[in-house]
Amino acid sequence: MQLLKSKRLMLLLITLASIFAFGVTTSLAQEKVKTKRKDYSVMVKYETFKVDDIEGHALNLYESRGVGVGSTGENAFISKGQSDLVKGNGTHQGYYKNTDKDGDVFFSKWQGKVSTTQSPEGKPIMKWEGTFSYVKGTGKWENIQGDGTYKGGFIARGIYVNYVESEYVIKK
């Protein structure tokens, strides 16, 4: 009889431990969110510094502002960056501050490559692509973690479009 009570108690404890462990494991699992958006942006500041070590080498500092539209809704953003280009080809990097319609913000850091070709009319066509990672968030974006890719290019003087895909989680 005592043995039967011990077995029942042990079975009850194992069951409770399993329920607790499963519940904790489930709550620790974070749902990954995949996003796609299209960013429209205008350069508002642009400064070039010629390096003069080789022909066409320049460092550029810039700021752009724009609107993103996609799977997470609409948002306004500011992007600040720099590029190191030789005849329009090279690298770029910077930071992105996104503010959604509720005023919540996330920041990301981006880096990539820039390439420039000539159109049949002889005009330069500048395109870029790269990666980014989320670095901080406020409000609903607090504890955001993840990364993504972007591709873009100028569509008119000082106006560009980026196609952005990402995956993120909000850590609890």
State where each predicted segment sits:
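Glycine-centered signal
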Residues: 3, 26-27
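Beta-strand-enriched cores of mature, soluble protein domains
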Residues: 28-172
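Bacterial N-terminal signal peptides that target proteins for export
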Residues: 2-13
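Bacterial N-terminal signal peptides
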Residues: 12-23
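Compositionally biased, low-structure terminal segments
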Residues: 5, 21-23, 78
